[in-house]
Amino acid sequence: MSQGKIVQIIGAVVDVEFPRDMIPRVYDALKLDENGLTLEVQQLLGDGVVRAIAMGSSDGLKRGMTVSNTGAPITVPVGKGTLGRIVDVLGTPVDEAGPIDTDKSRAIHQAAPKFDELSSTTELLETGIKVIDLLCPFAKGGKVGLFGGAGVGKTVNMMELINNIAKAHSGLSVFAGVGERTREGNDFYHEMKDSNVLDKVAMVYGQMNEPPGNRLRVALTGLTMAEYFRDEKDENGKGRDVLFFVDNIYRYTLAGTEVSALLGRMPSAVGYQPTLAEEMGRLQERITSTQTGSITSIQAVYVPADDLTDPSPATTFAHLDATVVLSRDIASLGIYPAVDPLDSTSRQLDPMVLGQEHYDVARGVQSTLQKYKELRDIIAILGMDELSDEDKLTVMRARKIQRFLSQPFHVAEVFTGSPGKYVALRDTIAGFKAILNGEYDHLPEQAFYMVGSIEEAVEKAKTLN
């Protein structure tokens, strides 16, 4: 094991000089002898000097301190022992519940599965959220992105998906909190504990207040745990179906930007790192399904200034099977979840996958809403009276559809006071089909707001009259 000395410290970036014949490799973990701080090698500068990023606070470091090369990348504990536990980027438990009971560990840098090992699937994953199941259905083993600006409900939507999928799903889940609020991590832990599924979830947190090195690598730590669960074979030689939640992918990119600037790289568009696409690809290519098991990932993606063309969300789009776009305009109407039914898409929206009825209803809903969107300008200038009878009917149905796309969430029950609803896919299709066919033209549009199934809307209408 070679030893070196610190020669320069610039914030989270530390330069270490090693003997020339014992230089560490890129991504090797270095350990500070004095306080056990871990550094990760990012660049070889020549003359025996390596540039590393600190996986913790660099306060108190000084030149001349001794650093040891571990000879391997950062390794984290994996396996059943991590379930129900909260760990940090280095796999160290932070929940004050003692050491992790596992003898297995894995390096956080792994190669993505080869092309011939991959497996594609068209099996649908029911979420119980009407707008998602109808218009942007999720595939088992697929990748889903929740896109939205600040405060439109990405985390609440993700928590509801965890609530509906992870609780019903008999498999294991991994939650990676990347650069988000500590409060949200705490809420998630208690949510899982109260619903008795904590023993099926491994949690990896690197909050907003952590140094950029932690936030950059915490997604890889969570992914490494998920990969292990996917690849671990049972007695029948099969792997597992794992759920992998990431909140928030944008913070991963942002940490990469901070690290890139500290390493002295020239910034590219909008100040992002020049290696943005490669870093994103390296993470996303590993989140995939193989012949043995699957990883279904749901990722929240913050959209800076609500601009979907920003390089960070734009780079993420390319890797996803389904995109759920949350809109501030829809949130301002009081419709939650604030999913934009026209912007959100899914590769599964295909009659060969969904069946003809589901496909026709979904396209019918979208075309009605699109027509309403086009008519809104005319209504704003001339009023409803200037529309033809056919257009008036379209607008009336579109407004009912818009309200019926809202739904009370289980996780928001404490704020709203109305109990959460899980709506089965067949009820969702039947409800929207009936509205499109005009079966509920006689009901007031308010009856469709914040209900579960169409039967509830009918009951609500009775109380409104």
Swiss-Prot record:
Keyword Ion transport: yes
Predominant location category: membrane
Top enzyme class: translocase
Molecular function GO terms recorded: ATP binding; ATP hydrolysis activity; proton-transporting ATP synthase activity, rotational mechanism
Keyword Cell inner membrane included in the entry's annotation: yes
Recorded topology in the membrane: Peripheral membrane protein
Database matches in CDD domains: ATP-synt_F1_beta_C, ATP-synt_F1_beta_N, F1-ATPase_beta_CD
Localization (cell): Cell inner membrane
Keywords: ATP synthesis, ATP-binding, Cell inner membrane, Cell membrane, CF(1), Hydrogen ion transport, Ion transport, Membrane, Nucleotide-binding, Translocase, Transport
Catalysed reaction, written as an equation: ATP + H2O + 4 H(+)(in) = ADP + phosphate + 5 H(+)(out)
InterPro entries: AAA+_ATPase (IPR003593), ATP-synt_VA_C (IPR055190), ATP_synth_F1_bsu (IPR005722), ATPase_a/bsu_AS (IPR020003), ATPase_alpha/beta_chains (IPR050053), ATPase_F1/V1/A1_a/bsu_N (IPR004100), ATPase_F1/V1/A1_a/bsu_N_sf (IPR036121), ATPase_F1/V1/A1_a/bsu_nucl-bd (IPR000194)
Binding site for ATP: 148-155
GO cellular component: plasma membrane; proton-transporting ATP synthase complex
Signal peptide: none
Assembly and oligomerization: F-type ATPases have 2 components, CF(1) - the catalytic core - and CF(0) - the membrane proton channel. CF(1) has five subunits: alpha(3), beta(3), gamma(1), delta(1), epsilon(1). CF(0) has three main subunits: a(1), b(2) and c(9-12). The alpha and beta chains form an alternating ring which encloses part of the gamma chain. CF(1) is attached to CF(0) by a central stalk formed by the gamma and epsilon chains, while a peripheral stalk is formed by the delta and b chains.
Family listed: Belongs to the ATPase alpha/beta chains family.
Protein's job: Produces ATP from ADP in the presence of a proton gradient across the membrane. The catalytic sites are hosted primarily by the beta subunits.
Protein name, UniProt field: ATP synthase subunit beta
